[in-house]
């Protein structure tokens, strides 16, 4: 469990496809069913969002999914219970994407205890600055749960080195300035940015924010170790276009074999 399980997703040159699902969007049974589907479809890791009322890093698709979950009365405790149940059926690593507020409101010790019980392997907290990560980092380290760092296009080299040197799991490289969401293409400087991040960390580098097509996946996979696909996966799940998710996963695997 934990850090080692995430590492294994990248071993021997494997490229990681990491889909994002919003916890409780469509109900908790739907969450479990979607995780089972993504596991069977060959996803490397599944990222599960904890819905929050003020999601500053999320684009409209993920915001709507979070609002649907909150409006239906889904709770953090309920999401943990669903993960505990589905964990008995799947081996895929779980990474939670949560804002800091739900962690503190739940009680950070209790939150991490629930993570252990649910077999959570890593956590991403987009609004937790590196300088304040000691709020939860020591507890996560003790629990063998990776605190996955985010770096951005505007992060200086020294900061990237500092952030990633003390981190575990993988580096989440944000490929656009702004919020998550589907985009048509990426600027050329994204390539040099990803190469820069790769050359300054010992961890696998995963690109995320705005990746939505097979072409995006193939482009990013040539430079880095994996991709997170969020808004597009939510749209495809909502519209029952699951074969297109399988095609995105296949694009990752084909690049791995090439």
UniProtKB/Swiss-Prot annotation:
PROSITE patterns: TRP_SYNTHASE_ALPHA. Gene3D superfamilies: Aldolase class I. It comes from the Bacteria. Keywords: Amino-acid biosynthesis, Aromatic amino acid biosynthesis, Lyase, Tryptophan biosynthesis. Transmembrane segments: none annotated. One of its GO terms (cellular component) is cytosol. GO terms for molecular function: tryptophan synthase activity. It catalyses: (1S,2R)-1-C-(indol-3-yl)glycerol 3-phosphate + L-serine = D-glyceraldehyde 3-phosphate + L-tryptophan + H2O. Pathway: Amino-acid biosynthesis; L-tryptophan biosynthesis; L-tryptophan from chorismate: step 5/5. The active site is at 47 (proton acceptor), 58 (proton acceptor). Its EC number is 4.2.1.20. InterPro entries: Aldolase_TIM (IPR013785), RibuloseP-bd_barrel (IPR011060), Trp_synthase_alpha_AS (IPR018204), Trp_synthase_suA (IPR002028). Belongs to the TrpA family. Tetramer of two alpha and two beta chains. The alpha subunit is responsible for the aldol cleavage of indoleglycerol phosphate to indole and glyceraldehyde 3-phosphate. This is Tryptophan synthase alpha chain. It comes from Bacillus cereus (strain ATCC 10987 / NRS 248). The gene is trpA.
